[in-house]
Amino acid sequence: MTYHPKSDFIAIMMERGFLADCTDYQGLDEALVSGTQTAYIGYDATAQSLHVGHLLNIMMLRWLQKTGHRPITLMGGGTTKVGDPSFRSDERPLLGPEQIDANIAGMQKVFAKYLDYSDAKNGAMMLNNAEWLDGLNYLEFLRDIGRHFSVNRMLSFESVKSRLDREQSLSFLEFNYMILQAYDFLELNRRYGCVLQMGGSDQWGNIVNGIDLTRRVLENEIYGLTSPLLTTSDGRKMGKSQGGAIWLNDEMLSPYEFWQFWRNTTDADVGRFLKLYTELPVEECDRLGALQGSEINEGKIILANEVTTLLHGAEAARAAEATAREVFEKGGVGDDLPTLSLSPAELGDGMSIVQLIVKSGLAKSGKEAKRLISENGAKLDDAPLTDAGLMIDAAALASPIKLSAGKKRHALVQLEG
């Protein structure tokens, strides 16, 4: 791209690799230069925590605020009841109001780590689209809003087309999602002067619908900006690991496990991830990303420390690094490792090593645990495990034991009391 932005926000987005597409670079850039603008990203409340896959867009909101503009985090209390069909192969399970509220409460904890929700001129706002969606009159909505949408055009969006091409069912409920999301943008523009919606590139169709609707109804000029859907250099979806999703709430994933996820970054991704997930200068990100051989580990440790500090604080980052050094360099146990605590009643006369590997989160199933053992991928206190029938009793847990799956995943098992 040859466009040379005037605004700090667009310049940072381009320089650090956040941009996939924009509906009007020049128009948005000029709006951002003219004064404080308001932008939003929407989040459906489908889980009790956000995960690493959401982190790129959270960093976009953080940079938006750091460059003087107001971010809105829009909770999908209304749209979660419908479910976003974008690029999904099946319909999302429907959640009840209590579960949606609990999920929103869990997600809010994360946003407060990255954004300033004070009364400052560009203080962030947290809103819930249930505020305007729950009370909609269906017939009035069809008359006033539905008439602006072309079904032909909606069917042409890749997010819908790909599902229909596979001859997979798309319910009328899900089909309405893009209309509701478009209406969100209209309401945010009308109520709060919001001029920009951001999201992953899979949201392009939904964003464009919102822009078109707002132009038709309010005759206001607004914009859309998307980020790339990230995969790692080896093709894995960002935010997933062998153990499952990398959650951002510490009650669902310990700061140590979060730190370790970033420490395990593939060499080829270090520079790119430093630009996207930290606030280090671009020149320093490039320097660290260009390190070769064992020297690249410096970049990985800095990446892990910087990202963990943003989410969990500097003390948690230091503790995670210290635990990693204790475990990997000195062969120790480490106080900050994920820990499985068993009561005497739960342990009973003993528990199989396969059960312990599963319960500690190092394997998803007994079958996977047995495979780890048979392929020499499991260790007990740094010694290879060879017997899948091994029983662990209270005597064996007189002091905590360390279980390992491969070289990088570890957990402690201890007896309570």
Curated annotation (Swiss-Prot):
One cellular component term from this protein's GO annotations in UniProt: cytosol
Keyword Protein biosynthesis belongs to the record: yes
Catalytic activity: tRNA(Tyr) + L-tyrosine + ATP = L-tyrosyl-tRNA(Tyr) + AMP + diphosphate + H(+)
Alphabetized PROSITE patterns for the sequence: S4
Binding-site residues for ATP, renumbered to this chain: 240
Segments carrying motif 'HIGH' region: 45-54
Motif placement: 'KMSKS' region: 237-241
Cell compartment(s), UniProt: Cytoplasm
Keywords noted in UniProt: Aminoacyl-tRNA synthetase, ATP-binding, Cytoplasm, Ligase, Nucleotide-binding, Protein biosynthesis, RNA-binding
Enzyme Commission number, as recorded: 6.1.1.1
SUPFAM superfamilies hit by this protein: Alpha-L RNA-binding motif, Nucleotidylyl transferase
Sites where the protein binds L-tyrosine: 40, 177, 181
EC top class, as a word: ligase
Ranges where the S4 RNA-binding domain occurs: 351-415
GO molecular-function terms, A-Z: ATP binding; RNA binding; tyrosine-tRNA ligase activity
Presence of keyword Cytoplasm: yes
BP GO annotations: tyrosyl-tRNA aminoacylation
Protein family membership: Belongs to the class-I aminoacyl-tRNA synthetase family. TyrS type 1 subfamily.
Function: Catalyzes the attachment of tyrosine to tRNA(Tyr) in a two-step reaction: tyrosine is first activated by ATP to form Tyr-AMP and then transferred to the acceptor end of tRNA(Tyr).
Quaternary structure and interacting proteins, as annotated: Homodimer.
NCBIfam families in the record: tyrS
Annotated protein name in UniProt: Tyrosine--tRNA ligase
Source organism of the structure: Ruegeria sp. (strain TM1040)
Gene of this entry: tyrS
